[in-house]
Swiss-Prot record:
Organism: Pseudomonas aeruginosa (strain ATCC 15692 / DSM 22644 / CIP 104116 / JCM 14847 / LMG 12228 / 1C / PRS 101 / PAO1)
Keyword Nucleus (UniProt): no
Cellular component GO terms, alphabetical: cytoplasm
PANTHER family given in the database record: DNA POLYMERASE III SUBUNIT ALPHA (PTHR32294:SF0)
Protein name per its UniProtKB record: DNA polymerase III subunit alpha
Keyword Nucleotidyltransferase: yes
Family of the protein in this entry: Belongs to the DNA polymerase type-C family. DnaE subfamily.
Localization (cell): Cytoplasm
Quaternary structure, from the entry: DNA polymerase III contains a core (composed of alpha, epsilon and theta chains) that associates with a tau subunit. This core dimerizes to form the PolIII' complex. PolIII' associates with the gamma complex (composed of gamma, delta, delta', psi and chi chains) and with the beta chain to form the complete DNA polymerase III complex.
Top EC class of this enzyme: transferase
GO molecular function: 3'-5' exonuclease activity; DNA-directed DNA polymerase activity; nucleic acid binding
Entries under SMART domains matching the protein: POLIIIAc
InterPro entries the UniProt entry points to: DNA_pol3_alpha_NTPase_dom, DNA_pol3_alpha_thumb_dom, DNA_pol3_finger, DNA_pol_IIIA_C, DnaE2/DnaE/PolC, DNAPol_HHH, NA-bd_OB-fold, NA-bd_OB_tRNA
Main location: cytoplasm
Length: 1173
């Protein structure tokens, strides 16, 4: 039977919001229905084109490439209409690409991509157009009863697309389908225009309709049962078979036949798999190959001046090693046709370095290239660390080289901008990414559109483990609680069922973290482009894999935060060096064998050190005790699940410290020739490069062939491995190596190849880790100031880093509008000055306003002076309050003294006055500004005019803040306590039942009691599945980790919250691993609970005068509200009597904080306290 239908209108998941068709299932479904071709016409984009083309061709289906577009209305405020375009040939494909790209760059309005009809006319060649049925402008006219207008429009489009314009009809059970169809058929007949039938496909199977509706509602932010929601789609818009379409259009067979005719007319070949590099301009007409050689040997001489002074023993022989390696690499690069690639990367890195943008020493396998090193693309000598070029560029496996380049976060966009200027702004773009509906999010989204409760969605979502790559199926398999919940809750099961259908569907677009493409001509010759509404933020519509398949070469411009930290630290250091008349420090020339740096590393004091700051890494460092850069390089490779779980890590450490025999590679089967290869890792096969070198040394492989072997081992295909094993043993035999030994070593290599790490990457990043450790060792304050600045928006991280500063004995100065900058800085006394940008609610704009005023008019004197001088349009009341509560205006208050003790004694009154005066200061400043603008006299003029005037006179009697209020203000604005500690308020009291501070604890078998603030809490499960907790306590003297095993944890769980003050009873012991102490908790109490159990009485010292009037009644009511078991005693004095009174049992109270504070507020702090046994 002849196929009588091809689908020509279809939206995939890349028609964001209104398509549910996935590309791979589409090709399979089309083939299954016996159709020879299918079109994809995504709305206003061609994002799926390469995926669709490759998948369809692979399934033996002819791909027809097209797009649906929104056409601008002829009237100013008229409705948009659709038009569907299909590419007939290469010219049509190019025109469609240009048209879609132009829509993005010039036609964005109100969130839609709108195409002007003149643009369509200019791009019509090579395109077939379908009228888009009732959604097209002809359809609009027909349904409005304007037949003459519809005819005029049709004739106009038939002129634009001669013999290539089709009147489209649909029967999808949607409103007006039939009315449009009958009118369209009559119109087509009058104008002698061909008809075409489509099913406007949105999903593959009919049962997917509900999932599609859900997806649309998620995109539109509506619920499924919203009565105002337009019902745009029907359950008939699925991928119908030719038979179903034949039955549906039995009265219009020509409309079906025309789909096949159109499919025959559309013949495009998308060129994939061929690379196109932009031309690199060479000087003096030199050929690109010659110029690469010239630049490389010039760079080698520069590098050798530092690496290999001419008085080095065996200078010529050592130099020749570099020359030979360089010639070898250059021959391969030139043979493979990649000189231009290297020169382009060299060029933009050179520009970055010359323009103050720090560049990383290397990343990935590119660090293995000597050519890259001499061209200053990388900064690590590959010969010194046995890094292999073939790991980067293998002549036996043709693929593009791929340099990942790290730039300082601040300067990365400047480098991209330079490249755009150098190669043409229409030739340079970043790359699109597609966000998908991930497990946790899709559950919440589905619940929302189904109208389910937030609580149910939250509960269900939280049952899905928070793990990279987590899927709904995986979560269901892993979590018994989730399975039970879904079985017991019908609504949850309904959410889950729908979420499974939508999981993984494309949800939105983004920008690739680092990918940049540089085209040899304009970008649209290779990929359609997208951008933001202003025409900026250019991205290719093809993702990174598709854009490379289309022929564009991807360059990775990655932002590495650590480079920014190093840059900021160096700026602070070299400013100080200049003040002292010292030479600037150059991070690229620091010694790599610095003993103090390795001492810091061996103690695992690696908080803020790149790659080495996690808890697990610190534990590994303490065991390994690195003493050279090779050890640091190994650390990064060792700290991964494979090596950690295989026993390789312990073996490595034991061999390093002489606790296990060094063998190359195994005690039972050794080959002496492997010692040079494996010596840096104590005989352990740790790196992919070592796998390659073993194959070279033992079996005579070329390094290119060895790289192929390494890749084969990574894939673990049994047939391939058997073949490789035979080749390896044969090669060994040819080198006189016993077959059994060769087989055993091959098996060992195969086992470890799965764990092998790219040494080039590890070495380059190991160097950055060393640089940060060196800075922390030798310039701790500038380094920590830079790290704090980098993390200032992450409050949790700032808290950790401030604690680290305290541990390092670094002094920290509170934020201060007269001294602080936006960033953290270091003052002349070596103290870290808190950055204003780290105060919550104070952004870059307000800080700029403050620093500009300070630069113009000097330090601020009072709050009133501050408000008068800064621009209050940039600093609002909320910002001002945050500055006061953070302590940044302390020096502007009435009670500030330079002597720290005096300052601390009055800080609570100071901040209370500032908060009270804030409103008046703002009003005074605003009035002054208005008066100044109008030329009138200022009612508040006296506040600012007289230097000696007491501007705080109206507010001096304000009640001072309590310690708790002051510290809460700091916690709210800074995320931490800066001028005190919550335990300070209870210091005298807690010493009665926790007699030792944390710093004074010693290991003992007796139960000891500790009071402290919970600053960190980790919860995990033991082997039985019971929860256990690890709580870090801080009492300002020190910290200790308390472990709570299942029973103790269950009993205390409600008390275990960050920032809670608790009392812990337990056994203190030595932690041999960390070298510190640990506490095994037996019991955890709140402060109130400890008071109740240990306090003898609540005691008050009161004079008769204090008990006059309503105070007795107030006291009775207060005690009534706090009934408990603690006795009350009263030291009573009057003019003629003195007595110690014991209140009766009916007046016992619960000695809670708010009771004690209320009594102290009323009678004075020193007159109310607890007596302990």
């Amino acid at each position: 039977m002849t196929v009588s239908f091809v689908h020509l209108r279809l939206h995939t998941e890349f028609s964001l919001v209104d398509g549910l068709v996935r590309v791979k299932p589409l090709a399979k479904a089309v083939a299954g229905l016996g159709m020879p071709a299918v079109a994809v016409t995504d709305q206003s984009n061609m994002c799926s084109l390469v995926k669709f083309y490759k998948t369809a061709m692979g399934a033996g289906i002819k791909p027809i490439c097209g797009a649906d577009i929104w056409l601008a209305s002829r009237e100013e405020d008229g409705p948009l209409s659709r038009l569907s375009l299909l590419a007939m040939n290469a010219k049509g494909y190019r025109n469609l690409t240009e048209l879609i790209s132009r829509g993005w760059s010039e036609g964005q309005r109100n969130g839609e991509i709108i195409i002007e009809r003149d643009w369509v006319k200019e791009a019509a060649e090579g395109l077939i157009a379908l009228s888009a049925a009732k959604e097209g402008e002809i359809g609009h006219a027909l349904l409005d009863g304007e037949e003459a207008k519809a005819e005029a429009l049709l004739r106009e489009w038939m002129e634009v697309f001669p013999e290539r314009f089709y009147v489209e009809v649909q029967r999808t059970s949607r409103v007006n389908d039939e009315e449009h169809l009958h009118a369209a058929v009559a119109l087509a007949s009058r104008c002698n225009a061909p008809l075409v039938a489509t099913n406007d496909v949105r999903f593959i199977k009919q049962e997917d309709f509900e999932a599609h509706e859900t997806r649309v509602c998620i995109g539109e932010g509506r619920t499924l049962d919203d009565p105002r929601r337009p019902r745009t789609y029907s359950d008939q818009q699925y991928l119908k078979s030719p038979a179903e379409m034949a039955e549906l259009f039995s009265d219009l067979p020509e409309a079906l036949e025309n789909t096949v005719e159109i499919a025959k007319r559309c013949n495009i070949e998308v060129q994939l798999g061929k690379y196109f590099l932009p031309d690199f301009p060479t000087p003096n007409g030199m050929g690109i190959d010659d110029y690469l050689r010239h630049a490389s040997f010039e760079g080698l001489e520069e590098r050798l001046e530092v690496l290999l002074p001419k008085d080095t023993p065996d200078y010529e022989a050592k130099r020749q090693v570099y020359v030979d390696r360089l010639n070898f690499e250059l021959d391969i690069i030139i043979q493979m046709g990649f000189p231009g690639y290297f020169l382009i990367v060299m060029d933009f890195i050179k520009w970055a370095k010359n323009n103050g943008v720090p560049v990383g020493p290397g990343r990935g396998s590119g660090a293995g290239s000597l050519v890259a090193y001499v061209l200053k693309i990388t900064d690590l000598d590959p010969l010194a660390y046995d890094l292999l070029f073939e790991r980067f560029l293998n002549p036996e496996r043709i693929s593009m080289p791929d340099f990942d380049v790290d730039f300082c976060m601040e300067g990365r966009d400047r480098v991209i901008d330079y490249v755009a200027d150098a190669y043409g702004r229409n030739a340079v773009s970043q790359i699109i990414t597609f966000g998908t509906m991930a497990a946790k999010a899709v559950v919440r989204d589905v619940a929302r559109v189904q109208g389910k409760s937030y609580g149910l969605a939250d509960r269900l979502s939280k049952m899905i483990p928070f793990e990279v790559g987590m899927t709904l199926d995986k979560a269901y398999e892993q979590e018994e609680m989730l399975r039970d919940f879904l079985k017991s809750d019908e609504e949850a099961a309904e959410i889950w069922e729908m979420a499974l259908k939508l999981e993984g569907i494309t949800r939105g677009t983004g920008k690739h973290a680092g990918g940049v493409v540089i085209a040899p001509t304009k970008l649209t010759d290779f990929s359609p482009i997208a951008c933001d509404e202003e025409g900026g933020g250019l991205v290719t519509q093809f993702d990174k894999d598709d854009v490379e398949a289309a022929g564009l070469v991807k360059f990775d411009f990655l932002g590495l935060r650590t480079l920014t930290i190093i840059k900021w630290a160096m700026e602070i250091i070299n400013r100080e060096q200049a003040k002292k008349g010292l030479e600037p420090v150059n991070i690229d020339f620091i010694p790599l064998d610095d003993k103090p740096t390795y001492s810091l590393l061996q103690k695992a004091e690696t908080t803020a050190v790149f790659q080495l700051e996690s808890r697990g890494m610190k534990e590994l460092i303490k065991k390994l005790k690195p003493d050279c850069l090779e050890d640091l390089i190994a650390l990064v490779a060792l700290f991964r699940p494979g090596p950690l779980q295989s026993g390789m890590v312990d073996d490595f450490i034991n061999r390093k410290h002489g606790r296990a025999e060094l063998s190359y590679p195994h005690p039972d089967y050794q080959y002496a020739g492997l010692e040079p290869v494996l010596k840096p890792t104590y005989g352990i096969i740790l790196y992919q490069e070592q796998v390659m070198q073993i194959a070279q040394v033992m079996a005579g492989y070329t390094l290119g062939g060895a790289d192929m072997l390494r890749r084969a081992m990574g894939k673990k295909k049994p047939e391939e491995m058997a073949k490789q094993r035979g080749g390896f043993i044969e090669g060994c035999k040819n080198n006189g190596i016993d077959a059994d030994l060769a087989g055993n070593i091959f098996d060992l290599v195969e086992k470890f190849a799965g764990y092998g790490f790219n040494k080039s990457h590890s070495a380059a990043y190991g160097l950055v880790s060393y640089q940060t450790a060196w800075l922390k060792t030798h310039f701790p304050a500038p380094f920590m100031a830079a790290v704090l600045t980098a993390d200032m928006q992450n409050t949790d991280k700032v808290v950790t880093l401030i604690e680290e500063c305290r541990h390092m004995k670094l002094r920290i100065v509170a934020p201060d509008v007269n001294n602080s900058e936006f960033r953290f800085t270091v003052d002349d006394d070596g103290r870290i000055v808190y950055g204003l940008g780290a105060i919550k609610g104070v952004g870059e704009g307000p800080v700029e306003a403050i620093t500009e005023c300070r630069a113009e008019g000097g330090p601020f004197n009072t709050l009133f002076d501050f408000c008068d001088r800064v621009d209050l349009k940039r600093i609002n009341k909320r910002t001002l309050e945050a500055l006061i509560r953070a302590g940044a205006l302390d020096r502007l208050g009435p009670h500030y003294h330079d002597e720290l003790k005096a300052y601390q004694a009055t800080v609570d009154l100071n901040r209370a006055v500032l908060l009270a005066a804030m409103e008046e200061a703002i009003q005074a400043a605003e009035q002054t500004a208005r008066s100044h603008d109008s030329g009138h006299m200022d009612l508040f003029g006296g506040v600012f005019a007289e230097p000696e005037a007491d501007v705080y006179a109206n507010h001096r009697k304000v009640k001072e803040l309590t310690l708790k209020e002051r510290l809460k203000g700091e916690k709210d604005t800074l995320g931490l306590y800066l001028t005190g500690h919550p335990i300070d308020e209870y210091e005298g009291e807690v010493r009665r039942f926790a007699r030792q501070r944390i710093v004074e604890l010693k290991p003992a078998r007796d139960t000891q009691t500790v009071a402290g603030l919970i600053v960190n809490l980790r919860v995990m499960k033991n082997k039985k599945g019971d929860k256990m907790g690890f709580v870090t306590l801080d009492d300002r003297s020190g910290r200790i980790e308390a472990s709570l095993f299942s029973e103790a944890f269950a009993a205390a769980q409600s008390l275990l919250q960050t920032d809670a003050l608790v009392v812990v009873e337990g056994e203190v012991s030595q932690d041999d691993f960390s070298g510190g102490l640990r506490l095994r908790a037996k019991r955890v109490m709140s402060l109130e609970e400890a008071r109740t159990g240990l306090a003898e009485s609540l005691r008050m010292k009161l004079h008769a005068d204090l008990l006059k009037g309503d105070r007795l009644r107030w006291l009775g009511e207060l005690f009534n509200r706090h009934r408990g078991s603690c006795p009350i005693t009263l030291d009573y004095t009057s003019a003629d009597a003195k007595a110690l009174l014991q209140f009766g049992e009916s007046w016992r109270v619960d000695p809670a904080d708010d009771l004690i504070q209320a009594l102290r507020d009323q009678f004075g702090r020193d007159n109310v306290f607890l007596n302990y046994r």
